[in-house]
């Protein structure tokens, strides 16, 4: 099992698919990295030499923000919005949808499980 950016990459998958196990690398970036390093599309991870794995590591370190650094940056961006007190920050603080979705009937994922309300007693 190759270890890239602190993540164990599955050995039996194609390189493009395996790179997507790293947080911050999707299909587009995975294809870009393999082209930059010069690895064929169909090659599997267990077929890579140590030199090729090292080249992939260096390409990711140089050009992409992944894993912990990316998570930290996203968290800092959300914290900055909350500290500013802007509308988006308030929505984050109250755990409500940020991008204008309706909340009257939906948004259960963001708001959490429904709270029981006592009905009218007869």
UniProtKB/Swiss-Prot annotation:
Native source organism of the sequence: Bartonella henselae (strain ATCC 49882 / DSM 28221 / CCUG 30454 / Houston 1)
Function: Located at the top of the head of the 30S subunit, it contacts several helices of the 16S rRNA. In the 70S ribosome it contacts the 23S rRNA (bridge B1a) and protein L5 of the 50S subunit (bridge B1b), connecting the 2 subunits; these bridges are implicated in subunit movement. Contacts the tRNAs in the A and P-sites.
GO molecular function, one term: tRNA binding
Record-linked InterPro entries: Rbsml_uS13_C (IPR027437), Ribosomal_uS13 (IPR001892), Ribosomal_uS13-like_H2TH (IPR010979), Ribosomal_uS13_bac-type (IPR019980), Ribosomal_uS13_CS (IPR018269)
Record-linked PANTHER family: 30S RIBOSOMAL PROTEIN S13/40S RIBOSOMAL PROTEIN S18, SMALL RIBOSOMAL SUBUNIT PROTEIN US13M
Range of residues in the leader sequence: none
Entry-linked HAMAP family: Ribosomal_uS13
Domain of life: Bacteria
PROSITE patterns the record matches: RIBOSOMAL_S13_1, RIBOSOMAL_S13_2
Name of the protein: Small ribosomal subunit protein uS13
Subunit note: Part of the 30S ribosomal subunit. Forms a loose heterodimer with protein S19. Forms two bridges to the 50S subunit in the 70S ribosome.
Xref: Gene3D superfamilies: 1.10.8.50, 30s ribosomal protein s13, domain 2
